[in-house]
Amino acid sequence: IVRNGEVTELRKDIVDLFDDRTVTFLIGSSVSFDGLLAEKGYPAAFGPTIQLTALPCTPVGPFAGNMAVTIRSFAPDLVDDVWAFTSHFPTCHGAPIGKNNAAELGIEDLNVNMNGQQFAVPDGTDRLYWACGITPRIVAEQAKLPFMISYTPGHAMITDIPTESLYQPNN
């Protein structure tokens, strides 16, 4: 639960916070296709974890901030296939926004995630970066909305929509 830009409470049940004024947005996640990547023979060597970039999002009214990205690493011989496959899932963030381009994205410390935790990407793998669904939460927090219900990474909305049904062959 976020109030005036600050996380004030962590909850597993939010039903009592909803009323007829509540508006919801469900944001897709690249985590949705992780299982399919492994099934296709494209297992991530590392990830996912989240890093904050220096790339500004297009501001709209009080909403402004930088993009967060999800990082995964893959063996170099899998990168083109992973890129092509994930491009068919635009509602799950689609293709990566970059490969091995942390400096271009404004990521200063290659091995520290958004929460300040160290991580290690295996040597000889390529880092791929996807736009991350935590970005809207960051931007909304910076707007200091009086009240917002958000998710915590790793604790997102789960639906009965099969990931395979999100595949768009013409993308």
Regions found by a protein language model. Name each.
Residues A120-N171:
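C-terminal functional extensions of proteins
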Residues I1-F119, I149-S150, H155:
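Conserved mixed alpha/beta catalytic, RNA-binding, or beta-rich assembly cores of soluble enzyme
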